[in-house]
């Protein structure tokens, strides 16, 4: 029996279709999300492809499996002292003031998840829309009926055929949104188990309320085996957290800029069916897909095997995103080096540990690699840090930080080779009143 229209009333048999996808090895969370999308697609309210509830549920499962300790009063006091020291040091180096928003100095993994989940959804919804639109376009542009395996019968009327194509396209939209929500939720859950603070991911996620907030449980895990005084570890991580919080709180455009480049990437997504067919045939011939493995399709999708070829506009978007992420990390590394390298005996060991973890075991990198095929290389981050150091030498600390007023004042990859020429090519404003 096929899996398209029901035998009695000609309505689409989506339960059978979802069962077929399950038998092909598609992840259970992905199928559940697609089913939920179908059940709600008649709702009068606009529905996001990626829902906060779906992301949160998957991330919570991963957090719970690892354990989430409550934050005690002693944790708050110790980390509050570390942040005070960090902010005192940073006051003398960077232009951006610390936030005056009331906040605690420490939070749990679950607190961080709840505070950032809506930003994650906003950030990657445009990507889901782009991929879903591309899939829908493939179905709607198909001439004639879908294969009989999808229709359940060769005798459907033209109206039924068109209805099935439209409904199948809706199913694929839900499927794609759920797939991305599953991957994103898993990545966020892994992040929650590893980041040391609310801003450790080095992108603004606190909805305009960027404050320094550390995660004691993960700090203890981060410092295991280092053999370094815990107080130095806390101050070092507080410096990173406080510097990032100041950068994000005083440059609100950064959040929209990152979202805009992801949106630009998503809008450029298109699907070349012939190319995907070719990739599948080559993958099976090379043994990359085992047709006897029921999880083959899930493995192929999650590994990015059928990633569409990027357009020039998408390549530009990824270049901008990579540079923004590298410049943020590079600036943080640079400014904390300026204030702490001579004050903390273990500073060099601590910053090297940070860089090594980013390069070899970064859940944030994995999220971007899985969803956008983007990896920010450690070399690019080192180059970005060196860029900020040279800008300070040429323009001073204030001139360095004024570069963050607008994306127009940030370099592209080629600009890193000649910092002086880049600075001469842009006009950095003297008035920062619009930032503060």
What are these regions (language model features)?
Residues 79-217:
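Auxiliary, metal-adjacent structural segments of Zn-dependent hydrolase domains
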Residues 99-105, 252-261, 346-349:
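Short, glycine/acidic-rich hinge or "gate" loops at secondary-structure transitions
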Residues 178-199, 248-301, 316-343:
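Post-HExxH zinc-binding segment in Zn-dependent metallohydrolases
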Residues 205-220, 293-311:
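A short mid-domain helix/strand-loop element embedded in enzyme catalytic domains
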Residues 219-239:
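Short pre-active-site segment immediately N-terminal to the catalytic Zn-binding motif
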Residues 232-250, 388:
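Active-site recognition of the HExxH zinc-binding catalytic motif
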Residues 303-436:
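Pan-zinc metallopeptidase signature
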